UniProtKB/Swiss-Prot annotation:
It comes from Pyrobaculum islandicum (strain DSM 4184 / JCM 9189 / GEO3). One of its GO terms (biological process) is rRNA catabolic process. InterPro entries: ExoRNase_PH_dom1, ExoRNase_PH_dom2, ExoRNase_PH_dom2_sf, PNPase/RNase_PH_dom_sf, Ribosomal_Su5_D2-typ_SF, RNase_PH, Rrp41. GO terms for molecular function: 3'-5'-RNA exonuclease activity; RNA binding. Catalytic component of the exosome, which is a complex involved in RNA degradation. Has 3'->5' exoribonuclease activity. Can also synthesize heteromeric RNA-tails. CDD domains: RNase_PH_archRRP41. This is Exosome complex component Rrp41. Gene3D superfamilies: GHMP Kinase, N-terminal domain. One of its GO terms (cellular component) is cytoplasmic exosome (RNase complex).
Length: 246
């Protein structure tokens, strides 16, 4: 493995100045895509994901519909300008197809698809800027976009990442930590139900480090959840003020 250009962890401090259990700055805006039924933009530091939801609506072609539940389709895509790597083909990459499937499976436990028989819900996610943790930022954005669309949900799904960097368990991996760390653990968590919907383990973890990582992921998800709730409330308070006056 290549050495990182800078030390990733020294004297209890990460290369970007954060403590091990500290998220990057989290910014969330709901209702950012005007022609979508629901949308959200989520930034974890420099990583920015925009999600737009269309539906529930009638399934076409009809033979793909299910009589007892709706179908959710998720498309994850990285904008050509989101990374320094040159992207020549608009065709989805193998990684984008895989992450699309992972995100759909992480969102489905939170969505009451039984309320929407013979219907479909389309979720489109665009990564505008990538600096680590893109799939978990996408998960949070997609969950908020579904809520903004008025889709029946059991809980929000909050995505966070935890990793091993120079033997330390750290929260919210940036690009350097994602590239040069010894392990990573993307997590999807429903804070009210206290259930995980996504756990992907990469690297060599001891049992103790893994349990430490799970606890840190829950802490991070609960922090982001408060930001997500505030963003949803802010949008609908603004709408109410526009309708009824201040």
């Amino acid at each position: 493995m290549k050495k990182p250009p800078v030390p990733l962890f020294q004297n209890g401090v990460r290369a970007d100045g954060r403590a091990p259990d500290q998220m990057r700055e989290v910014n969330i805006t709901v209702g950012i895509v005007s022609n979508a039924d629901g949308s959200a933009m989520v930034s974890y530091g420099a990583t920015t994901a925009v999600a737009a939801v269309y539906g529930p609506r009638e399934m076409h072609p009809r033979h793909l519909s299910l009589p007892d539940r709706g179908v959710m389709r998720v498309r994850y895509h990285m904008a050509p300008f989101s990374t320094k790597d040159e992207r020549k083909s608009p065709t989805p990459t193998r990684r984008e197809i895989e992450i699309s499937k992972i995100l759909r499976e992480a969102l489905e436990p939170a969505v009451v698809l039984e309320q929407y028989p013979r219907s479909r819900i389309d979720v489109f996610i665009e990564i505008l800027q990538a600096d680590g943790s893109t799939r978990v930022a996408s998960l949070t954005a997609a969950s908020l976009a579904l809520a903004d669309a008025g889709v029946y949900m059991r809980d929000l799904v909050i995505g966070v990442s935890v990793g091993l960097v120079d033997g330390a368990v750290v929260l919210d991996l940036n690009g350097l930590e994602d590239q040069y760390g010894e392990g990573d653990l993307p997590v999807g968590y429903m804070p009210n139900l206290k259930r995980f919907t996504l756990l992907q383990l990469d690297g060599a973890w001891t049992r103790d480090k893994f349990l430490e990582a799970l606890n840190l992921a829950i802490k991070g998800a609960e922090f982001v959840y408060q930001k997500a709730r505030d963003a949803l409330k802010s949008k609908y308070m603004t709408i109410a003020e526009d309708i009824y006056g201040r």
